Each structure stands twice: as C-alpha cells, then as structure tokens.
Amino acid sequence: MSMLDFDEVVEHYQRALEEFVKGNPEPNKRLFSHQEDVTLANPLGPAVRGWEQVAATMERAASNYRDGEATGFESVAKYVTAELAYIVEVERYKGRVGGSAEIVAIALRVTSIFRPEDGVWKIVHRHADPIASSRPAESVVQGT
C-alpha cells in the first residue's frame, strides 16, 4: 500500500466526515474496520470497542448534526508504513448541533489510525475531542 493510496483514503475520509456533520454516518461507517478490535472515542460519550458498538455510536453521534459542512482539515502529523498509518488533524466544520437552529463553528482535535484489510486501508481507531486550543491545567479537573 503506497503513500498515494493512503492520501486518497484520507481524502475519502474527509468527504465522509462532511457527510457526517450533515447527519449521515453511512460513508464514514464504510471506511471503518468491522473487526472486534476497532475503537472509537468521540466527544459525546465514552470510548467504545467492537464494530457493533462503534457503528451504533456513530449513528447516535451523527444524529446530533445537521446542515454541516467542512471548513478545513489542518494536518498536524501523518505517518505511513506498509502495516499501519495515522493522521493527527484539527477538523473544522460549521453546522447545526443538537436541537439548535443556529449554525455554529466546530473544531475537533482528532487522531485516526488505519491498517490495511484485504488490500484496503481501514480506520481501526478514531479519537476526537474539542480541544483545539490551549487550556489551563485546571481544565482537566472534574467536579466531584
């Protein structure tokens, strides 16, 4: 699997993510591994493992977005080998979130890990959180 192949997969992934913020998880789901070791950690809930849980989590998460569009993908890092690849990006969108009628800006810090399955790069892990800028150390403290 070449770097060129991987770059094409990343482009497909970014287009699928734009569909996701329109409320459609299906293109994104097709890019994920359907194996039991696939994991997803999104900002709307705890991390999940296994295809069935990942698919259900994606469907729930996508249902929170409407009328979205991608406004940019800022590459932080990329690494590709024959057996594993990852990207770290800041994903930027605008759209309606939850029940709000207002279009808002969305920024996510994301790490995605890929591996080849049957000659095709598949996502085996995605971690996304809304931390796209510096925060004070106390921001990690949770109330008791």
What are these regions (language model features)?
Residues 31-34:
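Conserved catalytic core of Hanks-type protein kinase domains
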Residues 1-27, 37-144:
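A beta-strand edge to alpha-helix "cap/lid" segment located at domain peripheries
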